[in-house]
Amino acid sequence: ELSRGLGDVYKRQYLNKIDVLKNHINRGDVYEANFCFEWFSEHAKINPLYVYKNLNKISKSPMSVYFKNKKLHLICSSPERYLKRNNNKLISQPIKGTSRRDIDFVIDKKLKDNLSLDPKERSENIMIVDLVRNDMSRFSKPGSVKVKELCEVYPFKQVHQMISTIESKVDSSLKISKIIEGSFPMGSMTGAPKVKAMKIIDELEETKRGLYSGAVGFIDPYGNFDFNVVIRSLIYDSESKHLSFHVGSAITAKSKGVNEYDECLLKGKAMILSLT
């Protein structure tokens, strides 16, 4: 049985924290912050690989991964790319903006169109695009940082997502460590300005994120790499039987706490279904 995040008691606590966060925004401390909370079970007995396969039937995503490190298992169906390098080209694809899918084609198209035109969702996305552009400009060739797609809406199995694509060119001698140091943690999971947003959400969030909102990927022998953003993910300790997942959303001045809470429930739906 999963606890935290379910029921009226935690919902009230969540809404109170959103009010505190919006006070920071209204004071000008930050423009946007990604606030997350955790659902967990302390006595879960699952087959991690089976749950991963089940999750990817329910919510097939392009940046999914199953990763095992001794007793820890990451069961991830992420739709989001943090950063990809192909020779001298870098690509980042932050996600901000989510709406549900519907089995009715007409309703589903309307949901997609509404997301595409939603001024709040577009504002959230554009703020993070600006942050990513700034991060990438630290190590990219001057004038090479370009926004290739802005606020494009893509359908996934469970949700519609608003995605932007930023590209740049880097010197062939640039070390991977410099790229990661200059851009991690990713703006879509922190906020803007990044450092101040991180300090505020660290104070407000009740549990540490751990691997959640981090990145998993590969590096080839030529220095090319591809990393996801660890979201829509279950993390399982097969020794202690602790199972958890985080969900979150971007908070801005226009955010309504009840709507943000509902968005978190939507994002958590596939993880819950994968366990049944």
Regions found by a protein language model. Name each.
Residues 68-71, 78-79, 84-89, 140-142, ...:
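Short acidic-glycine loop/turn motifs at beta-strand connectors
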Residues 1-10:
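Single conserved hydrophobic/aromatic residue that forms the stacking wall/gate
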Residues 162-276:
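Conserved hydrophobic core element of enzyme catalytic domains
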Residues 84-157, 238-276:
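Cytosolic ligand/metal-binding cores
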Residues 31-91:
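SIR2/sirtuin-family catalytic core signature
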Residues 11-24:
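Phosphate-interacting basic helix/loop segments used at nucleotide- and nucleic-acid interfaces
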